[in-house]
Amino acid sequence: MAKKIIGFIKLQVPAGKANPSPPIGPALGQRGLNIMEFCKAFNAQTQGVEPGMPIPVVITAFADKSFTFVMKTPPATYLIKKAASITKGSAKANTDKVGKITRAQAEEIATTKRPDLTAADMDAAVRTIAGSARSMGITVEGL
């Protein structure tokens, strides 16, 4: 028989830097889950990832106080900012452009994000990434 699910917890945790402090501790603690067990398992799974890269994670909490978690791909905004070599997007995206990325960089980001995107094909995924970049005040060359 399947375990009874008591809830899902969605967090963004820096790769390799999960610790019991907020936001992880309170989110897991209120459901009675072992915080250190999650931190050790998450840090072990993110060893090959660039340290500090935000990784979205969905934790499934079960009634017997056990859990499983699924890691998603890093946020598109993080990957776009990294490709454009900027620290933050524009406050006025339509008027102030803060950087630019090429179509090749957008394709690379789309390839990374593909498992989490709902795009039907690669071209649609690239257009999705380009739209995110434009909303951050970053121009996409070759699109």
From Swiss-Prot:
NCBIfam families: L11_bact. Part of the ribosomal stalk of the 50S ribosomal subunit. Interacts with L10 and the large rRNA to form the base of the stalk. L10 forms an elongated spine to which L12 dimers bind in a sequential fashion forming a multimeric L10(L12)X complex. This is Large ribosomal subunit protein uL11. Forms part of the ribosomal stalk which helps the ribosome interact with GTP-bound translation factors. The gene is rplK. The keyword RNA-binding applies. InterPro entries: Ribosomal_uL11 (IPR000911), Ribosomal_uL11_bac-typ (IPR006519), Ribosomal_uL11_C (IPR020783), Ribosomal_uL11_C_sf (IPR036769), Ribosomal_uL11_CS (IPR020785), Ribosomal_uL11_N (IPR020784), Ribosomal_uL11_N_sf (IPR036796). Keywords: Methylation, Ribonucleoprotein, Ribosomal protein, RNA-binding, rRNA-binding. One of its GO terms (molecular function) is structural constituent of ribosome. Coiled coil: none annotated. GO terms for biological process: translation. The keyword Nucleotide-binding does not apply. It comes from the Bacteria. SUPFAM superfamilies: Ribosomal L11/L12e N-terminal domain, Ribosomal protein L11, C-terminal domain. One or more lysine residues are methylated. Belongs to the universal ribosomal protein uL11 family. GO terms for cellular component: cytosolic large ribosomal subunit. CDD domains: Ribosomal_L11 (cd00349).
